[in-house]
Regions:
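C-terminal and inter-domain tail/linker signature
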Residues: 1-124
Length: 124
């Protein structure tokens, strides 16, 4: 499993309230910075699980990965609205676990699944 695969799996499980894999791969001193706002591991859990019924995370693609760093991009959809965005994350590792995650989000005008070989239902 790639680092990006593990990240996405942990976050998807956390969206459903299952933090076992999240706790396994995320460092106790974890910090997340999203759109310029920093939060710790416990607050991140609340944010992720609170968004679980609202957001579908689509496919992802790794831009760069080594032992201490991951940069990857993924699509997201707000389930009740026709809002789509692209998320780019810079993920730092310490002792083999995620220590810092910096994510920026950019709204995109059209559904990224249109004309592609995937659909949102595959990721719900």
């Amino acid at each position: 499993m790639t680092k990006a695969d593990a990240f996405v799996r942990a976050w998807k499980l956390a969206q459903k309230g299952d933090f076992s894999f999240f706790d396994e791969i995320v460092h106790t001193d974890y910090e997340s910075e999203n759109q310029g706002v920093s939060i710790n591991k416990e607050l991140s859990k609340g944010v992720i699980s609170g968004n679980g019924n609202l957001i579908t995370i689509g496919p992802h693609r790794t831009i760069y990965e080594d032992n201490s760093f991951l940069c990857f991009v993924r699509y997201a959809k707000v389930r009740e609205d026709a809002l789509f965005c692209e998320l780019i994350s810079a993920v730092h590792y310490k002792d083999g676990k995620i220590i810092k995650n910096e994510t920026i989000r950019e709204e995109i005008a059209s559904d990224p699944s249109e004309g592609e070989d995937w659909n949102w239902e595959d990721y719900e």
